[in-house]
Amino acid sequence: MRFRPCIDIHNGKVKQIVGSSLRDEGALAEENFISESDASYYARMFRERSLAGGHMIILNKKGTPEYEASYGQCLGALKAYPQGLQVGGGITAENAHDFIDAGASHVIVTSYVFSNGYLNMDNLEKIRDAVSPEHLVLDLSCKNCDGVLTVMTDRWQKKTELELSEELLDKLSEYCDEFLIHAVDSEGKSKGPQKEVLDILKDFSSRKVTYAGGIATYDDIRMIGELGNGRIDITIGSALDIYGGHLDMDEVICLCRN
């Protein structure tokens, strides 16, 4: 079990937000924390602790001025910690290698692959071929829609016709190196992880999986470690001390390693 750090960038600033509140219109989101430091500050912090494999997400819509501001922050962080961070947000087969060349270890993809509500195999194969599976993370972030854990796209605003399941993970494993799963209903709320999501991930072992969403206590971390027998890596955002929360990051790191 590893602790995977995160850097969420919105409107050119490092933030922690309530995931379900994101709106492209007006570039709005409910904010838990806005940092006075830039993304490279956090990248250096993670590099000093040898925390590889963290994810950095641009939470603005591609093609907007806000995206460009966030993109600049992203490049600064990659320069500060080359090969230490995975990057998501506006990634396509056409620009994926630009992020790899800039220092990302992996690119993280959702909307490009799950377009118009369905799995787009042509796009999946294109991006796999562009960067190779070894540099690709598929984000299967999900939300409970009428009792079904539904894969969400476009900064968690649009639902697909796909249900998160071990069968879906198995089907996609040959195309990627890892999976990232945000439990959108829990993201940014610090009210505990979403057990129904973890129950799907707990026995999956074909690829590395990182869970994010709602982790708020050290007991939450222990529970995930026990449930997944150490196979599920975790990300903590709003509850972490570096983002204004109450969990000490160094203690979290030690707990995950032990």
Could you tell me what each predicted segment is?
Residues 119-130, 222-258:
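C-terminal helical cap(s) of enzyme catalytic domains, especially alpha/beta-barrels
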Residues 53-72, 111-117, 181-190:
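Glycine-rich, proline-tolerant flexible connector loops at the mouths of alpha/beta enzymes
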Residues 73-87, 91-106, 196-234, 250:
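Catalytic cores of alpha/beta
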Residues 55-56, 108-109, 137-139, 180, ...:
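Conserved beta-strand positions in the central sheet of alpha/beta enzyme cores
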Residues 67-74, 120-125, 161-166, 191-199, ...:
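Charged helix-capping and loop-helix junction motifs
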